[in-house]
Regions:
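C-terminal binding/interaction regions
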Residues: 2-19, 65-126
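Hydrophobic "anchor" residues
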Residues: 36-37, 111
Length: 126
């Protein structure tokens, strides 16, 4: 699967976002080492702290299906700026793959690629 195909899946996932408060739909497509892809969208909540990001939605779907070896994640947000994962998502993802590729898009379709370890070189670990 190409980076663009994975990003297209992330953009499609954003269509399902529940964002009555933030008005900021985000979609993610997470690829596992065996090629399986899990998508996720962000889900707002009136208690803002209970909101869940698209990246963690996709990761929880993967883990709850028995997948724990992540290779790439594509993140699409409806913004003129690149949609980077928040600190909580970076910490959450590194639990499963410190060196995975993170593709961050903006609404015009362009995207950049980083290694998770570059985006969060110091993370909490036991």
């Amino acid at each position: 699967m190409t980076d663009q195909e994975l990003m297209d899946m992330a953009k499609k996932a954003a269509e399902y976002a529940y964002v009555p408060y933030s008005k900021f739909p985000v979609g993610a497509a997470l690829e596992c080492s065996d090629g399986t892809v899990f998508t996720g969208c962000n889900v707002d909540n009136a208690a803002y702290g209970d909101t869940i990001c698209a990246e963690r939605t996709a990761a929880v779907k993967a883990v709850s299906s028995g997948h724990r070896d992540f290779v790439r994640i594509a993140i699409w947000g409806n913004s003129k700026e690149y949609c980077y994962p928040c600190g909580s998502c970076r910490q959450f993802l590194q639990e499963f793959s410190k060196h995975m590729t993170v593709l961050c898009a903006r609404s015009d379709g362009s995207f950049v690629s980083h290694k998770l370890s570059e985006m969060m070189p110091f993370f909490f670990d036991f």
